[in-house]
Design a protein with these regions (language model features):
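Active-site-proximal gating segment of KS-fold condensing enzymes and close homologs
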Residues: 10-23, 124-139
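Conserved beta-strand-centric core segments of catalytic alpha/beta enzyme folds
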Residues: 1-58, 158-231
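Beta-strand segments within the central parallel beta-sheet cores of soluble alpha/beta enzyme folds
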Residues: 1-3, 65-73, 109-117, 143-151, ...
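Conserved beta-ketoacyl condensing-enzyme motif
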Residues: 2-13, 109-129
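Stable alpha-helical structural segments in soluble proteins, enriched in small hydrophobic residues
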Residues: 97-105, 131, 135, 168-172
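Condensing-enzyme catalytic core mediating Claisen C-C bond formation in acyl metabolism
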Residues: 25-107, 113-114, 231
Length: 231
């Protein structure tokens, strides 16, 4: 799990780096715009999320409601090389992390039904989508549904992975993908994948496997793969 409280002191540093959105101060609900041509930086977020992780035997013994199974995952660092920096990921490192997670989960890339991306509403979004396509070897026609939870709740720091993983297991449980809002004007470099971006709730009866990622800050990457649990 993870928790994040809003701090003017913490976010002032990001504002000084000019990575926060300033164009929608009067309309904050429109400010977080991942994958949008008019994205202008990310929006601070806060909150908390907890996932109780235990063995299948333990969960069944105590009669727990099982939401999903963790198939596998991976973490790595791009080494601050080839475009990687304190605030941006190395695309090759991102792709290695995705592929390593798929291998660890012992699945085929074609089994990924949906992606919960890092997608922060910065200039790195098109590069991230391209990395997903390359790592999963998916064409625009076969590209999974892709969404950004940050479009609705902003970008937390220590809690981002926990919050968005909770969203993943709930989507798997109920078989839907939540919208990536404020993306009416899809970035031109992502346009060929536009059909994979839900603008409203997308019901997906076939949704079984979802991959969640956190990329970027410090050039450190993490991916986890979840599968819906069938009772």
């Amino acid at each position: 799990g993870g928790t994040e409280g809003s701090s003017h002191y913490a976010w002032a540093g990001f504002d000084s780096m000019r990575v926060l959105c300033r164009a929608h101060n009067d309309e904050p609900e429109k400010a977080s715009r991942p994958m949008s041509a008019s994205a202008g930086g990310f929006v601070p977020g806060s909150g908390a999320g907890i996932l109780h992780v235990e063995s299948l035997e333990s969960a069944q013994a105590r009669g727990a409601r099982i939401y999903a199974e963790i198939l596998g995952g991976a973490i790595n660092c791009g080494g601050h090389r080839r475009g990687g920096s304190m605030t941006a990921p190395n695309a090759e490192g991102v792709q290695r992390c995705i592929r390593a997670a798929v291998v660890d989960a012992a699945i085929d890339p074609d089994e990924v039904d949906a992606i919960s991306g890092h997608l922060t509403a910065t200039g790195a979004d098109p590069k991230e989508v391209a990395s997903w396509a390359k790592a999963l070897q998916r064409s625009p026609e076969t590209f999974p549904a892709i969404t950004s939870t940050k479009s609705m709740i902003g970008h937390a720091l220590g809690a981002a992975g926990a919050l968005e993983s909770v969203a993943c297991v709930l989507m798997l449980r109920e078989r839907f993908v939540h919208p990536s809002i404020n993306c009416e004007d899809v970035h031109p470099e992502i346009e060929k994948y536009a059909g994979s971006i839900p603008h409203v709730v997308r019901e997906m009866p076939e949704l079984n496997t979802m991959i969640k990622a956190g990329f970027g800050f410090g050039d450190v990457n993490a991916c986890a793969i979840f599968r819906r649990w069938a009772d």
